Amino acid sequence: MELEKFKDANKDELSMIEVAHEILHQRGETMAFADLTNEIQVYLGKSDEEIRDRLAQFYTDLNIDGSFISLGDNVWGLRSWYPYDSIDEALVHGEDEEDEERPRKKRKKVNAFLADVSDDDDVIDYDDDDPEDEDLDNDYDDEDDDDDEGSHELKQYTKDLDDIDDGDDPEDELADGIEGQLTEFSDADLDEENQD
């Protein structure tokens, strides 16, 4: 296939997106992505490996470039062929034809706030009082009894502390070696030093 626009151009300098645009423009009809890629490969004379390496970037460029449009099923065309208002209609019309061939399933409407009789496990009934709430009310009376036991334990502990002898044990005193080296200062001694 010869492209008139690129007669004098060096094929090595052409991008795949430019060639794709010209192929679609010259043919005047939509093409599948695989067929379009094969046409580009033949025109540019590139190997399968070279095309495979550039394929992801080419597909990205097709999507990003505003002059191409995907018509579904990986079929591509030029956006200029479709008036702006008819683009949505053409796409929606294609979906409508498929819908006519197979009947649609009717979906059951679900209201999340209404309880379904068969699914009582999933529904939370906020009107019923929980048995745990009743248990809490009854436990307040029992806590008063616990306070009496706690105060008894406190009294026993205090008594045990009083029984401990606070007297000085001979073992607690240090040998005269360390205590003898310590000096006690009285306020009078400190006042004398400040006057000097």
From Swiss-Prot:
GO terms for molecular function: DNA-directed RNA polymerase activity. Residues 119-196 are annotated as: Disordered. One of its GO terms (biological process) is regulation of DNA-templated transcription. GO terms for cellular component: DNA-directed RNA polymerase complex. Pfam families: HARE-HTH. Residues 14-81 form the HTH HARE-type domain. Residues 119-150, 162-176, 186-196 have a biased composition (Acidic residues). The keyword ATP-binding does not apply. It comes from the Bacteria. InterPro entries: Asxl_HARE-HTH, RNAP_delta_N_dom_sf, RpoE. Keywords: DNA-directed RNA polymerase, Nucleotidyltransferase, Transcription, Transferase. Residues 151-161 have a biased composition (Basic and acidic residues). Participates in both the initiation and recycling phases of transcription. In the presence of the delta subunit, RNAP displays an increased specificity of transcription, a decreased affinity for nucleic acids, and an increased efficiency of RNA synthesis because of enhanced recycling. RNAP is composed of a core of 2 alpha, a beta and a beta' subunits. The core is associated with a delta subunit and one of several sigma factors. NCBIfam families: RNAP_delt_lowGC. Belongs to the RpoE family. This is Probable DNA-directed RNA polymerase subunit delta. It comes from Ligilactobacillus salivarius (strain UCC118). The lineage of its organism: Bacteria, Bacillati, Bacillota, Bacilli, Lactobacillales.
